[in-house]
Amino acid sequence: MDGIVPDIAVGTKRGSDELFSACVTNGPFIMSGTSASTANGNDSKKFKGDSRSAGVPSRVIHIRKLPGDVTEGEVISLGLPFGKVTNLLMLKGKNQAFIEMHTEEAANTMVNYYTSVTPVLRGQPIYIQFSNHKELKTDSSPNQARAQAALQAVNSVQSGNLALAASAAAVDAGMAMAGQSPVLRIIVENLFYPVTLDVLHQIFSKFGTVLKIITFTKNNQFQALLQYADPVSAQHAKLSLDGQNIYNACCTLRIDFSKLTSLNVKYNNDKSRDYTRPDLPSGDSQPSLDQTMAAAFGAPGIMSASPYAGAGFPPTFAIPQAAGLSVPNVHGALAPLAIPSAAAAAAAAGRIAIPGLAGAGNSVLLVSNLNPERVTPQSLFILFGVYGDVQRVKVLFNKKENALVQMADGSQAQLAMSHLNGHKLHGKPVRITLSKHQSVQLPREGQEDQGLTKDYGNSPLHRFKKPGSKNFQNIFPPSATLHLSNIPPSISEDDLKILFSSNGGIVKGFKFFQKDRKMALIQMGSVEEAIQALIDLHNHDLGENHHLRVSFSKSTI
């Protein structure tokens, strides 16, 4: 059966498809004015259901436990990622609906997906299964006008006819998006890795035409306002993406409709973009993040010219593919997502395989422009260890201004490169690129090395050896403010200030955490001083079996 629903007048329970006419047996259901009344819970007639098993695939899908105020558009949007929705029947009195997909394959994919991921509408979990009926046929009764208008509006958008979708006639006829904004407010929670404007554009443009994006930080949260060409696309994106992670276990999307109906973008840069106005100025003389990152990665530009192919969302976001299902013409979150190469560093936490970056050879970094008088394998191990588990370090014997650093994998290498490239170490800005080497070779026995090659494969100082470690949540770019932890009770503020100024650095500020005195923030005179202090003092023995832990902080004092 499609599920159990109470019969309002009689008080018995029966399969919901019994709402349909007794004359229907595995055939189309023709919606008449009388049965429309029944479908809305206003008639107590009993109908005999057919004998088909609800587990048998059908183009018609039965949806239960809908919120009382659900709109036609919200119901339609459940099916949109899987293909064209060809018909809709709303049973509002029963908090149920039936939708008909264009193909049985699309319906099968949809049911399989929602079996694994429970859909939520307006905060309420809903239930989806195959209907006993192979086809829905509806008449022109007034009760169906809203559903048909919403279907017409959505399908016109899918076919590119935005004029019809935007027409007042479609809205007035009951388009579910009436009065709804095409602007979404997006909050990215657990932002352990950078999420750029272009990453957002690639993700959200899979649901419709993105016109404008503005990104900003509010209440210490990365947020964005994103405007679609139409509210149907906004609804589709919200239903498909809200609560999903961009990368594994982090960067969670929280999406609501904005009160704004349009965005006013003045500048095209890494913070805001109007895709309808490529002529807008950048607003400052600094190169945009796009250009900087593209240069760092040796790429001509951030955006991939190819369509969505290559890297995918994490397995939780790619259930149809993981299950071996075919998803034809998927316009939603289930289609493969190509992450721009310059955003590769952001994918480190998710271990997403990015074409051209995920090979074993790409876990080795070439670090150049080092200070040959001061560089040591240990200093590079500590610094690069902020962004991953360093396996080996080799300072080149005949060219000590160059070194090779081997990370645990390619994604950690990308993360370290994106955060450290260009920062000053021992007075010189370091340059970091991917090495052509697949691994760092240890010196042969008897080979002169002067201790310039070190193997750290089993180091106890690895920050990320435990899966799901909280250290993944505390990876930030180098900054003048350092986060200190594992401080014993006997150590005072003055003790730490003296310690951090002992190597010539200037301590500009200090603050213990109010709720946990084992942690503190300390602000150095510059980012370069903070980098040096981290190298010198991470794992410093403070006594009482406490070794100081030092990392870069996102906060300031």
UniProtKB/Swiss-Prot annotation:
PROSITE patterns the UniProt entry points to: RRM
Domain of life according to the entry: Eukaryota
Keyword flag Protein transport: no
Modified residues (Phosphotyrosine): 127
InterPro entries from the UniProt entry: HnRNP-L/PTB, Nucleotide-bd_a/b_plait_sf, PTBP1-like_RRM2, PTBP1_RRM1, PTBP1_RRM3, RBD_domain_sf, RRM_dom
Keywords of the record: Acetylation, Activator, Isopeptide bond, mRNA processing, mRNA splicing, Nucleus, Phosphoprotein, Repeat, Repressor, RNA-binding, Ubl conjugation
Gene3D superfamilies registered for this protein in UniProt: 3.30.70.330
Keyword RNA-binding: yes
One family name in Pfam for this protein: RRM_1
Modified residues (N-acetylmethionine): 1
GO terms assigned for molecular function: mRNA binding; pre-mRNA binding
Subcellular location: Nucleus
Record cross-link Glycyl lysine isopeptide (Lys-Gly) (interchain with G-Cter in SUMO2), residues: 65, 218
Residues modified to Phosphothreonine: 138
Residue ranges of every copy of the RRM domain listed in the record: 59-143, 184-260, 363-437, 480-555
SUPFAM superfamilies, alphabetized: RNA-binding domain, RBD
Assembly and oligomerization: Monomer. Part of a ternary complex containing KHSRP, PTBP1, PTBP2 and HNRPH1. Interacts with RAVER1 and SFPQ.
UniProt-listed PANTHER family: MATRIN 3/NUCLEAR PROTEIN 220-RELATED
Function: Plays a role in pre-mRNA splicing and in the regulation of alternative splicing events. Activates exon skipping of its own pre-mRNA during muscle cell differentiation. Binds to the polypyrimidine tract of introns. May promote RNA looping when bound to two separate polypyrimidine tracts in the same pre-mRNA. May promote the binding of U2 snRNP to pre-mRNA. Cooperates with RAVER1 to modulate switching between mutually exclusive exons during maturation of the TPM1 pre-mRNA. Represses the splicing of MAPT/Tau exon 10.
Protein name as it appears in the record: Polypyrimidine tract-binding protein 1
Organism: Bos taurus
